[in-house]
């Protein structure tokens, strides 16, 4: 098959995150399976194993997308339209099969990023207009929580397939757990990740258990978060793959304080190294952590602090969760994910629905 992805960012973008990783890993594995792959996305773009077409700026790309699509992949078998809040509305201008891929419905995230009038318009477009325009298009959701959110905004459940991301093979295979309490969080430093909440909780935990908190990742909130951070917090920014896996292997626990997610890729990555996670019982995170098996889900900030202290002081419990995290994470491998995606794509092409 000839499969074209269309999304608003490439991995070369400074703000690239889980969505961009998902597309790239899928694309590379589909290439290995013999499919032809292209990616249409907003700039900046980088060189990839597959062809990448620059759609333009953050918002101008939505106007350019139909024109560039028609010049490049108009006759391709399938367009995978990646929904990132503001839709491309591809069913209005493409005449061949479409598959919509959605990581999460943004809901309250609109208000975190935009002023009230724009946030209301964005939320209305995603929740009311998008389901209407895409009413015949099949969807792929990356978790049960995302599928539930799609149903809530009017997408038929029988049009939704669930496909969770995989993880790469670790660049480090030997785990050398830290002898002192070491805790890690990893991800983009943006409002919905709630790193400010994590730093508040850390002040309460540190006074009881000691140790260090390492914050991996970058983003627009970094300066303000560094100013907010107390003692024994280290911001390391973006790091290489080998360093990432080394830190996952050394850490006692991964902290994930996001308000919501589509899926927690870093939770599964940490689990690959036998590192359990502690997060909130919210969409996406609850799909990535099996409560009491691969980590712990907290109900509130106070509960998070209490469970964090409990896990830091209870080595047998950490070891039990470590083994559970390793076993659960072993279920998610990119080659298997790509095979399942190829089957879903084939069904979409065969149906002829657009």
Predicted stretch roles:
Residues 267, 276-279:
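Short hydrophobic beta-strand element within catalytic cores of glycosyltransferases
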Residues 118-139:
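Membrane-proximal helix-turn-helix segments that form the acceptor-binding/catalytic region
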Residues 223-245:
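Nucleotide-activated donor-binding/catalytic signature segment of Leloir-type glycosyltransferases, i.e.
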Residues 291-302, 310-316:
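Conserved acidic donor-binding segment of nucleotide-sugar-dependent glycosyltransferases
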Residues 145, 166:
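Carbohydrate-associated surface elements
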């Amino acid at each position: 098959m000839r499969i074209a992805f269309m999304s608003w960012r490439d991995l070369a973008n400074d703000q690239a995150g889980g969505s961009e990783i998902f597309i790239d890993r899928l694309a590379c594995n589909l290439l290995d399976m013999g499919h032809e792959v292209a990616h249409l996305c907003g700039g900046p773009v980088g060189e990839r194993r597959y062809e990448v077409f620059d759609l333009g700026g953050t918002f101008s790309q939505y106007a350019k997308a139909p024109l560039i699509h028609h010049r490049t992949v108009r006759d391709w078998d399938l367009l995978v339209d990646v929904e990132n809040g503001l839709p491309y509305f591809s069913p209005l201008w493409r005449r061949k099969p479409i598959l919509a891929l959605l990581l999460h419905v943004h809901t309250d995230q609109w208000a975190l990023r935009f002023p009230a009038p724009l946030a209301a318009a964005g939320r209305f477009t995603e929740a009311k207009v998008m389901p209407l325009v895409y009413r015949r298009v099949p969807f792929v959701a990356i978790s049960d929580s995302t599928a539930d959110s799609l149903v809530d905004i009017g997408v038929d459940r029988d049009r939704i397939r669930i496909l969770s991301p995989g993880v790469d093979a670790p660049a480090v295979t030997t785990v050398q757990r830290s002898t002192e309490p070491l805790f890690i969080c990893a991800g983009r430093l943006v409002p919905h990740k709630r790193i400010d909440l994590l730093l508040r909780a850390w002040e309460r935990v540190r006074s009881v258990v000691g140790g260090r908190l390492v914050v991996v990742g970058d983003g627009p909130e970094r300066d303000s978060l560094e100013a907010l951070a107390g003692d024994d917090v280290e911001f390391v920014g973006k790091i290489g793959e080998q360093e990432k896996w080394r830190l996952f292997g050394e850490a006692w626990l991964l902290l994930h304080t996001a308000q919501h997610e589509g899926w927690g890729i870093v939770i599964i990555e940490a689990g690959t190294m036998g590192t359990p996670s502690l997060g909130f019982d919210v969409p996406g995170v609850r799909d990535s952590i099996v409560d009491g098996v691969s980590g712990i889900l907290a109900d509130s900030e106070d509960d998070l602090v209490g469970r964090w202290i409990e896990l830091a002081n209870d080595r047998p419990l950490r070891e039990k969760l470590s083994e559970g995290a390793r076993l659960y994470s072993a279920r998610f491998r990119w080659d298997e994910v790509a095979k399942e995606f190829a089957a879903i794509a084939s069904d979409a092409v065969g149906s002829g629905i657009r």
